[in-house]
């Protein structure tokens, strides 16, 4: 029934990788099953042969989905099936999309969809690298115009050594988690989180990963040759040189002037005016002219004008030199009732960032294929439409917002205290209130400030900077602190976050081939200077964490009890702990080893909760006097509660010095009495005495008198 499948197996570091096609999903344009040491991902690619008429963008969609059966699990929840993509799935989809998107021809507008499904998972092999390899292989054998293949590698830094594709266990001990993807000749994408590594160490890791992934590229080329799918007969549409010349005559000089307007919204208004004038003039000449084609050529002209000016060494769009950072304004404690807040403004980019402290119960529970884990540091990034002066839909976070939030979190993670050092769950929210480039790096700066304002003892201040590149032939200019237009019209988006001593996160997206090690080195060095400048301004506003947390934040008090006593504090069906939390207004968390964490905004409430827990867990001591309450009477004596849940018997002979005929003549239920513990027998029964308790104070006074004299 099946033709013989094509299988390619190769060694990639410590892992064996297998590519297979020809058995599954034969109606797709291309489909590949990639296996890497028991982690298997099925990748399909479907491309439409025809583009939608008049479409002026490339509709590439990447869907990444993890099936729970891959780990031998059934989904939790009511519906028992996978739902919308998780944050992790969204981030992996972006990781796949970023290096492949620049490799399709500029004029190619046919719809392409990549669907990657994780069907088997080895807990020690993360699915993202095999997924990227499988996507590259599927596109390579699809016949779709694609200037690949690409390779992908994860790089760790363990004991001073770079490690290729470290296992999950190794990654836990690594100072670096870096993913790099690229073609045979160029790096296209880097995503990383680091523990204060130097610029030289980061660059070495990028180069190492790119060198190692050549094995993958060679294997995919051999796989492609064996499959031998005919290439599509797609030809790029001819350039309308006549229209291009007309638009240049009408708009070029005006655009040069417009791009000297330094204020973003005023510049945009002028560019829109010029575009409208061009449209009007061309439609007057030819009412049948294609307005979408006019728009595309006009946009290309904008790009040419800006790039030519930068390469010529002229001041940038907003008047800065290539290595200048925009004006900074840093404010902390801007919101009165939040636990920590900061307003970070860099030029026309602004982030209002808040930090909120919660208990460990507030931690995010993340159910992954490899198991459940808790995240005690959350960072959420919001990009509302008003921040760029637009109207738009406001709803659940988009892929871009999730990706930018994750990048900012990576930048801060290395300086966060451990849960043992700071037993709080911390949630940071970055509201982008103005945007003109590098809002994710503004979020890093604002997060660092908001955390310190909240009293979180971070190890060092962190700042972030976005670098850009314009390259024409052998000429290139590296730009510091890029604007939105420079990002859009340039060749590289290179974001670096770090402290004064090292890099904590690096993200790089390159739109062209030919980015050399030299260019990356210049960008990293230029970024270091900019980062240190920003840190110096931040330190003037707030140089370290505040001495105390906000008065509105919960204070966590820790105590330890015997593990055997946990059941007493919880009570039957949770009755005791529920009563404790409701009556004291605290949040109480109990760990299996007997550690109890009590969170309260008021100290008195925490003290009361501690006192009551101590009462519940206290042991009755022989010889000690207690103030107890009569629980019930019997003919032979009275049962007295000396501690919560702990009763003892006062025998009728121990009630008073004289003979007692009837217990009720001396005691009533609910009466408070002083009792001394005489004995606890093998069965745990407590024998009490009232008459011994009466004699004790006189004995104590006699014993303490000499001690007072000695003082």
Swiss-Prot record:
This is Polyribonucleotide nucleotidyltransferase. It catalyses: RNA(n+1) + phosphate = RNA(n) + a ribonucleoside 5'-diphosphate. Keywords: Cytoplasm, Magnesium, Metal-binding, Nucleotidyltransferase, RNA-binding, Transferase. GO terms for cellular component: cytosol. SUPFAM superfamilies: Eukaryotic type KH-domain (KH-domain type I), Nucleic acid-binding proteins, Ribonuclease PH domain 2-like, Ribosomal protein S5 domain 2-like. Belongs to the polyribonucleotide nucleotidyltransferase family. Mg(2+) binds at residues 487, 493. One of its GO terms (biological process) is mRNA catabolic process. It is found in: Cytoplasm. Residues 623-691 form the S1 motif domain. HAMAP family: PNPase. It holds the Pfam family RNase_PH. Its main location: cytoplasm. GO terms for molecular function: 3'-5'-RNA exonuclease activity; magnesium ion binding; polyribonucleotide nucleotidyltransferase activity; RNA binding. Gene3D superfamilies: GHMP Kinase, N-terminal domain (3.30.230.70), K Homology domain, type 1 (3.30.1370.10), Nucleic acid-binding proteins (2.40.50.140). Its cofactor is Mg(2+). CDD domains: KH-I_PNPase, RNase_PH_PNPase_1, RNase_PH_PNPase_2, S1_PNPase. The lineage of its organism: Bacteria, Pseudomonadati, Pseudomonadota, Gammaproteobacteria, Vibrionales. Component of the RNA degradosome, which is a multiprotein complex involved in RNA processing and mRNA degradation. It comes from Vibrio parahaemolyticus serotype O3:K6 (strain RIMD 2210633). Involved in mRNA degradation. Catalyzes the phosphorolysis of single-stranded polyribonucleotides processively in the 3'- to 5'-direction.
